[in-house]
């Protein structure tokens, strides 16, 4: 993985509070973007905070998180982001599958999950660094994500 894809990437953080099994929709993404007062530029990393990270130690953390609808993923793809991160441990619903991953991965977008402490982001625009471990042949890795506010 080239470092420029995960080191000091221009990033935007959006806040969309959600509870268990609630879908994240394109309308909510658009409203959160407008509320941020920022624009989402091609190549940006997009972080979506729902507040779900506070459920880290709860039995439903992995089984009932908020999830992205297929239309929300289409919205993300239309904005040509380089990385999508969220405080949910999974992007699709195990109870209402959206089946967007084949289309999503055709766009070579990195996924970052679960991100914690997005509620502490004070400004929506920043730089994201999320360096993976150098594991040969791996398709995933833990990272320590750092947010630097502009």
PLM region spans:
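Active-/binding-site microenvironments in catalytic and ligand-binding cores
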Residues: 1-150
């Amino acid at each position: 993985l080239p470092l420029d894809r995960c080191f000091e990437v221009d990033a935007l953080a959006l806040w969309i509070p959600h509870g268990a099994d609630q879908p994240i929709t394109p309308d909510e993404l658009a409203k959160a973007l407008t509320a941020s007062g920022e624009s989402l530029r091609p190549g940006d990393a997009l972080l979506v905070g729902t507040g779900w990270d506070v459920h880290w130690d709860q039995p439903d953390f992995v089984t009932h998180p908020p999830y992205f609808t297929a239309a929300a993923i289409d919205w993300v793809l239309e904005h040509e982001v380089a990385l999508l991160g969220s405080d949910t441990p999974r992007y699709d619903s195990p109870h209402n599958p959206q089946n967007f991953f084949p289309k999503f991965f055709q766009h070579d977008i990195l996924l970052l999950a679960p991100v914690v402490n997005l509620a502490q982001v004070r400004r929506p625009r920043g730089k994201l660094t999320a360096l993976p471990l150098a594991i040969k042949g791996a398709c995933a890795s833990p990272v320590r994500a750092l947010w630097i506010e502009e």
